[in-house]
């Protein structure tokens, strides 16, 4: 993976990491309030982010983010999540999500006690670009994001796409791939299961500023991140 390495002040890095985690959770909590689309899957996500903390920005979700369906079809909808019009001078970040209806209906499983599996570090080691997520990490994320999507429940659960995306964005920011104001497109290409190891790599195409997340065992592409 070819990246631009930059040395950051540790205090600044911690502040930006904290801000990004909170900001992404704000978007994802807002999306979870959208009713009538339980079991639908994320196709693509477009993010407009400012990686630098803003003066006076201390509160978690200090502005109200509202999901708005901007395009609707039988098997797909496009949702924009942004601040109210009167708050856009202060808060201009937003997220657009394409939700796709699965070919087969998803049954909501009965509530069951999830086994606490061994913890696998979320961001891998500092020496490689390996990531993996345990079932307990998934459960913690679902609580934080208020995510009740049935495809993330039960023994056959797939990992929340945003959990995987968030970890990738944090890793890429630490490596200097993104800074300042950034517009990104994230494509979700295949589902990922708990404990499945994946790694980050570049597109391998000259002039294409894209990063892919692939499974270690088969090299299957899970998602792509492109700077717009």
Residue map of PLM features:
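Acidic/His-leaning functional-site neighborhoods
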Residues: 135-212
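Arginine residue identity/basic-tract feature
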Residues: 2-4, 19, 23, 29, ...
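Hydrophobic, proline/glycine-rich low-complexity stretches
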Residues: 1-60, 152
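Homeobox/homeodomain signature
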Residues: 37-39, 89, 123, 131, ...
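A short linear-motif detector with a strong N-terminal bias
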Residues: 24-29, 40-44, 57-60, 74, ...
